[in-house]
């Protein structure tokens, strides 16, 4: 029953994209400046990939509550041979609930620091605003004293699902802090929809960036 439910959700979401989405040419310019852009960074090329569709659908369902001068933008990365990594705006419009702003032609590790920065910079360029907020979606191991690879977020196993404790590339929290320093943005807030990432140690590591 669970597999059937997941299949139905996947089919429904695919139909939603085909029937009710607008896809921009990657050369299209940015949107007009808004009040706030919330960026949801979904690092789903791991054991959480099966949940990306349903969680994204929840964002779409709540899109009608987004104020007209705010933007909710999702970077969606999941295990798929067909669906490319993309930056997608949730519009709140019933006729066109999602708007694909940019689709990457070549796959990449979302937890590589340079790629993390590039995605966020591109999203901020496409959806300029007076202020920005960030939601991190994916696996997290928080901040421990074991080794850097465990003070981390968003493991990426490439385009395959495997045991996230053994394989894949993490974005270490010290590296994430350096990414934020490079971006030079003071987030309105940083929300972590992942394990072990809402502790005081994580907040202290990122204290100067929100």
Q: Residue locations for each model-derived region?
A:
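Extracytoplasmic/secreted cell-surface and envelope-processing proteins
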Residues: 47-52, 82-84, 142-147, 197-202
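Short, surface-exposed polybasic-aromatic patches that bind anionic ligands, especially phosphate groups
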Residues: 14
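Sec-dependent signal peptide recognition
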Residues: 5-11
């Amino acid at each position: 029953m669970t597999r059937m439910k997941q299949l139905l959700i996947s089919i429904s979401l695919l139909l939603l994209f085909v029937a009710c989405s607008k896809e921009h040419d990657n050369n299209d310019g940015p949107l007009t400046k808004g009040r706030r852009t919330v960026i949801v960074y979904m690092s789903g090329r791991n054991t959480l990939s099966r949940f990306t569709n349903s969680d994204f659908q929840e964002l779409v369902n709540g899109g009608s509550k987004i104020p007209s001068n705010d933007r909710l933008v999702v970077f969606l990365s999941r295990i798929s041979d067909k669906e490319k990594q993309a930056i997608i705006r949730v519009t709140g419009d019933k006729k066109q609930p999602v708007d694909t702003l940019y689709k990457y032609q070549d796959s990449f590790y979302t937890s590589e620091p340079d790629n993390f920065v590039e995605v966020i910079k591109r999203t901020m360029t496409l959806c300029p605003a007076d202020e920005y907020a960030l939601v991190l979606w994916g696996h997290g191991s928080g901040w421990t004293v074991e080794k850097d690879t465990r003070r981390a977020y968003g493991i990426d196993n490439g385009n395959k699902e495997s045991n996230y404790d053994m394989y894949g590339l993490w974005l270490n929290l010290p590296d994430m802090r350096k990414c934020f320093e490079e971006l030079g943005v003071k987030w309105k807030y940083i929300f972590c929809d992942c394990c072990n990432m809402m502790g005081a140690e994580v907040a202290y590591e990122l204290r100067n960036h929100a």
